[in-house]
Structures are given as C-alpha cells and as structure tokens.
Amino acid sequence: GETTCDGKKKMYEMLAEFKPVHVIELPNCQTEAGIGLYRQELIRFKEVLEKKFGTVITEDAIRCQIHNRNQILAALNRLQYVMALDPAPALGLDIVNIVYGTGFKMKIDTLAEEVNAITDKIEAEYAQGRNIGKRARILVTGSPSGGAALKVVRAIEDNGGVVVCFENCSGMKPLDPIDEDNPDVYDALARKYLNIGCSCMSPNPRRMELLDRLIDDFHVDGVVDLVLQACHTYNVETSLVRRLVKEKKG
C-alpha cells in the first residue's frame, strides 16, 4: 500500500489484521527533499520483497522492467490519443475499459504489443470512414473512473456526448515515461511517480498544466470533474479546475 489518500491509509490498517501489508510512505510534496525520501522508501520496499521471497532484485533487472514499462506507457498514450481525432473513432467507455483492463494483465512482456495492435485496428477502421459521428466532446478529470464510477461515463455517452479524454489516474495522468538515462534507478522511479499531478500533492501545479494541455489536444467542449467521497483533496481542487476551464479556456 501507499499513503496517497486518507481512505487508503485507514483501509490498510484494517487489511493488516488478516493479510501481510507493507505501506510505502509517500511524501506529499514534489521537492528534491520529497524525492529523496521517496527514493529511500522504494529501496526499503525492494528490501522487504527480497526478504519475503528469498531473492535478490538487481539494478539491471529493474532497468529491464523500466524499459518494458515505458513501452507499455507509450502504447497506452498512443491508444488514448486516437480520441483526439474529430469525430471520435470510438466511445470513451470502450477505450477506458481497454486501459482499465491492462491493469489486470499478468503477462506484461507482450502488453505493449497487444495495446498497439488495438490502436492499429482503430486507426485502420477510422481511415476507412468508421467513426461515431459528431458529438459533444467531454474530458473527465478528478478521481479514478474505473468500476462503479464508470456510470458517469455511461450517462454522458447515453445522452449524446463522448468522453474523448480521461485526465485522471486511470487515464492520461500517469503516462509520462521513466527516465531510462538516469544512472540511479531508484531516483528515476521516485521522480517519475512523485511528479504525477495527484491531488494528494501540495501544491499540485502539474495537474492544472496537464489539464490545460489536454483540453487543447483533444478539442474538448466540456469538462466533467468526478469526485469520489474518499477523495477530499480532489473535492478541494474543484475550484481550481473551474477557474481554469471558465476563466482561461473559456
């Protein structure tokens, strides 16, 4: 587990009563000091795994997985950017279900190839004239939108819109690559994941910067801010999203 949101932290306490739990302490600031702390937490986690499974996790092995992960991130980014086409080639619900499903794949060595094959098919069919027609283009931001929260996406698309972009944690937010040229693999991982624009960060300018760019990239007509009950920090940031959308993007 990790200490991103308060709801998770309390849940891990209860989970630890009947399951082995290791919690990574996540600094809530994107500073050099925060990165240093998070780097140490990643090393501590590595040591816990080594002890638990009686193995040695080498830096070469980590580099290999960083490379594989970057390929997956690039493939997911490419898939979601097909929705920048206007009119959109597919419903947002179809795209988010594909993205959401990749998180449950156990065989990750071929995952990037599988996602790219789906994107190739969508692009080929679009070139032949297949699309969903002109609809209001909606961006969903805020809390993760998998599981029961997908009812919001269904409501939008059942009423004539299309969700062309998911800025949130289950969409575009975590897709920046890990720096493979960084000689320190733990520093590379810490910088990649601590610099995600999550609302648990204070301050959190990266979320608004990403949102600003995605509104333009996906030719967005409207923004829906999804806030789950346990995500109070996203609730607070709603005012910042409203200000960006209404005052800057117009």
Kindly label every feature range from the protein language model.
Residues 39, 43, 47-163, 167-175, ...:
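A charged, amphipathic alpha-helical module
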Residues 1-59, 165, 169-170, 174-250:
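Trp/Phe/Arg-rich N-terminal binding region typifying the photolyase-homology
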